[in-house]
A protein has these predicted regions:
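C-terminal structural segments of small proteins and small subunits
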Residues: 62-90
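Short S/T/G/P-rich N-terminal loop/turn motif that feeds into the first structured element of a domain
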Residues: 1-54, 58-70, 93-97
């Protein structure tokens, strides 16, 4: 079943975060992931939630998503993300076809 990583991002260093985005994309692709949402307009419809930025990644399954998160190619970009933004991240399983 497909799996989705959903990330809420509060950017604290915009210049550094742009570099992170440049480095993160190839690692996502190497693990079969693709960006479903990468920033863009975000509007709160219910509740008290006002994210600055949302990213949604799709992977083949939950295991593959975790492999990407912990892969050597993403180690340095991941550290960069931690330095340039405050993030909250969840992994959810999608529906089968």
């Amino acid at each position: 079943m497909p799996a989705y990583i959903i990330v809420e991002i509060d950017i604290t260093d915009p210049v550094g975060y742009e570099e992170y985005k440049r480095l993160a994309g190839p690692a996502v692709a190497n693990y079969g992931g693709k960006y479903i949402v990468r920033g863009g307009a975000c509007e709160t419809l219910e509740g008290d939630w006002h994210p600055q930025r949302i990213v949604v990644l799709q992977f083949e399954n939950m295991e593959r998503a975790k492999e990407w998160l912990n892969c050597p190619e993403y180690a340095e970009p991941r550290k960069m993300r931690h330095r340039t933004a405050k993030t909250r991240m969840i992994l959810v399983e999608g529906l089968s076809s």
